[in-house]
Amino acid sequence: MLSVPPPRAIRAIAALLLLALAGCSTVATTRTGFLGSYEELKPDSKDTRRLAFEKTEWKKADFTHVTFEPTVVHFSPKDEKKITAQESKELAAYCDAALRKAFEKSFKPGETTEAKSLRIRAAVTGIDTSSPGLNVVSGLLLWPMDYGGVSLEFEVLDAASGERLIALVGFSQGTPLQVIGSFSRFGHARSGIDHWVAELHKTVRPAQTKTASN
């Protein structure tokens, strides 16, 4: 008679099969043309997920106001097939809201002739979705295995002169620790947007970001 593997072995085999079926994330740092020029951006030795530029010794305290250009979606043809037009609009709107939430705590909205203003540009440039159905099954056996992700490009300008002060390109991929995000197609992407908006704000207002996190 053929012996039946124990339940633990069956679960392990099923988990390996699910892992093989789960899609690998394809998000990475991008150079879509949204920023116009990328020559100034340099790798970060502490974080391989980012490229960044910051103007030397610009007077951050002089800027008290902020304006935002609407976030755009700048996907490759491959990524465009992963997401509907409505979902693209919703991701852009999520990024808009995240930027306003982060920066309007530190800056007054709008431009003024009495003080310096920043203008922030943002683009969602890469996307990878999670598979909630696959993650429900794999979560019952072991843990969610299909992780989403997002790539973004940001630019901070002097609103009056148009001079570039900061440019940031980054990407995030979901992890096994982000369990809740695994059960939404864009849960990991939204977490990535939150992360990179916080990183951008940290660069613009490092002291305030540190104080707020304490």
For the regions a protein language model found, what residue spans apply to each?
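Short secondary-structure boundary motifs at beta->alpha junctions and helix caps
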Residues: 151, 160-203
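Surface-exposed short loop/turn segments
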Residues: 105-163, 174-180
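C-terminal motif of bacterial Sec signal peptides marking the signal peptidase cleavage site
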Residues: 20-23
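Bacterial N-terminal signal peptides that target proteins for export
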Residues: 2-14
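Stable alpha-helical elements in mature extracytoplasmic
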Residues: 91, 95, 99, 120, ...
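A structural "domain/chain start" motif
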Residues: 25-93, 205-214
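Second-shell loop/turn segments in exported
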Residues: 79-90, 107-109, 179-187
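Sec-exported extracytoplasmic/periplasmic mature domains
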Residues: 73, 96-108, 129, 201-208
